[in-house]
Amino acid sequence: MRKFLLSEGEIPKKWLNILPLLPEPLEPPLDPETMEPVKPEKLLAIFPEPLVEQEVSDKEWIDIPEEVLDIYSLWRPTPLHRAKNLEEFLGTPAKIFYKNESVSPPGSHKPNTAVAQAYYNKISGVKRLTTETGAGQWGSALSFATQFFDLQCRVYMVRVSYNQKPYRRILMETWKGEVIPSPSPYTNAGRKYYEENPEHPGSLGIAISEAIEEAASREDTKYSLGSVLNHVLLHQTVIGLEAKKQMEEAGYYPDVIIGAVGGGSNFAGLSFPFLADVLRGDKRKEDLKVLAVEPEACPTLTKGEYKYDFGDSVGLTPLIKMYTLGHDFVPSPIHAGGLRYHGDAPLVCKLYNLGYIDAVAYKQTEVFEAAVTFARTEGIVPAPESAHAIKAAIDEALKCKETGEEKVILFNLSGHGYFDLSAYDKYLHGELTD
């Protein structure tokens, strides 16, 4: 079989929280003013109470509200595919599977948390949300989600992506989102960069600063983000929970699990339910290889330093313990805009530091070569971010070709690339550089 489908009734009813399964406690966020663990009231200035509770929860399973499940059912469960054409093309004995998150209305995994965050903000009496977006995947997911709960949504979009991907902006505006190129002249955080250079390419760190500044300055507004924090990764575990069931249906357990990493949410969403088996002490699963893939232009895990740093460029967030290239690092304007982040989710960083996760970084051109191979064998044009996972899956499959091992490889196709065709155009005409 090529495709493994679950019924609507099999959408997971609970999210998996990996926090209580960690072999040692996660270092808490610190208040930069006191260097003490941040007090909940500081977080409540920008997040609603239910999400702050989820951020620090020690419960392994957290119920998914009915209202969230109802919207999930528009596209979930998502299919698991066996990439047989790709296997044949590579001539590998490996079996390659991918979880297809591109089938959501916004075209990526991002609505899994966007819908949940919009719901919790709505029941907390919030009227407006601000956020940042790189390639526009997160901004479009939050615009999509907020319309169901009658919330206003303002998106600060990294300027290089705003210019590269006009159709993402149109998508956000179709779903009632207001899109502002960042850095902008509308916030103190943005103005500093904007006045130096009105065409500043921007970064996720700067856009986060702008969105947080606005949320903190208005009573009716909270901040929402698409990656990095524990509650965001929690909501994404629906991906891996479904994939576990589907892999059982296919009759396999993966030897290798792969995901692209920018902030860590799609990677964690697929891998954490499998890593939970390892953390619970299942000896049969301890050889599981979990591989995080990042761009060489922003090699956070592979070249970053494990330390406390700000989550944004200006220093408005608490300090979080993560692998970081420095909060003022501005990556080159690669097309995988969703991977241009100086840090990574603390949970992903902790598991990497403890040796449960491996990491690899690739050049942009080799990633697009893998993307085109995938499009020409499996038919789906992947998002540049997802193509990083495809490149790693191909490399793992080619290793199996050399060794003769019949490994089972599972990767996350986190989104489609139909709004990224200008990048493909450049690649196909030899104009894409590293």
UniProtKB/Swiss-Prot annotation:
Domain of life, per lineage: Bacteria
A single GO molecular function term of this UniProt record: L-serine hydro-lyase (adding indole, L-tryptophan-forming) activity
Disulfide bonds, paired cysteine numbers: none
Keyword Oxidoreductase attached: no
Enzyme class: lyase
One Pfam family, short name: PALP
Pathway as given in its UniProt record: Amino-acid biosynthesis; L-tryptophan biosynthesis; L-tryptophan from chorismate: step 5/5
Family matches, as CDD domains: Trp-synth_B
Catalytic activity entry: (1S,2R)-1-C-(indol-3-yl)glycerol 3-phosphate + L-serine = D-glyceraldehyde 3-phosphate + L-tryptophan + H2O
EC number: 4.2.1.20
GO biological process: L-tryptophan biosynthetic process
Necessary cofactors: pyridoxal 5'-phosphate
InterPro entries: Trp_synth_b-like (IPR006316), Trp_synth_b_CS (IPR006653), Trp_synth_beta (IPR006654), Trp_synth_beta/beta-like (IPR023026), TrpB-like_PALP (IPR001926), TrpB-like_PALP_sf (IPR036052)
Residues bearing PTM N6-(pyridoxal phosphate)lysine: 110
Keywords from the UniProt entry: Amino-acid biosynthesis, Aromatic amino acid biosynthesis, Lyase, Pyridoxal phosphate, Tryptophan biosynthesis
Gene3D superfamilies to which the protein is assigned, alphabetical: 3.40.50.1100
Cited NCBIfam families: PRK12391.1, trpB_rel
PANTHER family listed in its UniProt record: TRYPTOPHAN SYNTHASE, TRYPTOPHAN SYNTHASE-RELATED
Record-stated family: Belongs to the TrpB family.
Purpose of the protein: The beta subunit is responsible for the synthesis of L-tryptophan from indole and L-serine.
Quaternary state and interactors: Tetramer of two alpha and two beta chains.
Protein name: Tryptophan synthase beta chain 2
Source organism (scientific name): Aquifex aeolicus (strain VF5)
Lineage, top ranks: Bacteria, Pseudomonadati, Aquificota, Aquificia, Aquificales
